[in-house]
């Protein structure tokens, strides 16, 4: 965990410099270096992140195209292409890292007045999506889809949501962002909704903890695993492959 704290501390210092009127070219340089290092870390990591074992096992048991799986179409097809072409899991991590960091960085640079602070914020809440799962790929696409809302390109917004569903089926709920974007929400209301969401998430965790004794077998095991990963920051035990 010391390594992760050092990254947090560096981004924190960079953010303070940026807030205190760091020159734009210097800010961009620090942002570019930080983003590249996080991008590099995202695909050279090994045995880290949520559901690592499940995804790695699935990759190693791909033997032909359009193989039956419980994963979404886009995620499954990319896994098949990489496995049957290269047979290397690190290449798969690299491909997904490119997708995530491309869209994530593009939005930050376009809309954030403080890119370094945005990166620091992302690291604080989600390790800047370094330890991603297929849901993270979908979130990156949804994150980028908001640019089409801003530019009033509605059809591209919905196309982007559809592509995101190819990586995680729950992405379709983001269509409600179209209606929320048209609402006039004050800063106070926004903070109120964020606070309510945070309290609701705490409530859900307590509910899950209460019902765990009532469910058995694999369901209980998976719930306990996800709750434990949420408490320790995602289960990032090691970083680099050997």
Task: Indicate where each model-derived feature is located.
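TM-lumen/periplasm interface segments of multi-pass membrane proteins
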Residues: 18-97
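Transmembrane-helix signature of polytopic, membrane-embedded enzymes
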Residues: 25, 105-123
């Amino acid at each position: 965990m010391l390594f992760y704290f050092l990254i947090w501390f560096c981004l924190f210092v960079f953010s303070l410099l940026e807030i205190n009127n760091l020159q734009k070219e210097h800010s961009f340089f620090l942002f570019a270096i930080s983003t590249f290092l996080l991008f590099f870390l995202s695909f050279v990591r090994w045995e880290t992140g949520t559901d690592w074992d499940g995804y790695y096992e699935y990759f190693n048991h791909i033997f032909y195209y359009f193989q039956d799986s419980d994963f979404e179409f886009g995620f499954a097809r990319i896994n098949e292409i990489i496995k049957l072409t290269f047979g290397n899991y690190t290449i798969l991590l690299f491909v997904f890292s490119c997708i995530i960091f491309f869209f994530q960085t593009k939005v930050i640079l376009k809309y954030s007045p403080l890119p370094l602070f945005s990166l620091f914020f992302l690291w604080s809440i989600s390790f800047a999506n370094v330890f991603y799962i297929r849901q993270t790929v979908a979130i990156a696409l949804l994150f980028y889809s908001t640019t089409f809302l801003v530019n009033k390109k509605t059809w591209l917004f919905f196309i982007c949501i559809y592509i995101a569903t190819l990586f995680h089926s729950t992405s379709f709920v983001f269509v409600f962002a179209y209606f929320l974007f048209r609402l006039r929400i004050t800063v106070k209301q926004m903070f109120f909704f964020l606070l309510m969401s945070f309290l609701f998430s705490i409530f859900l965790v307590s509910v899950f903890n209460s019902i765990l004794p009532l469910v058995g077998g694999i369901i209980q095991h998976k719930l306990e695993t996800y709750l434990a990963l949420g408490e320790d920051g995602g289960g990032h035990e090691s970083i680099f492959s050997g």
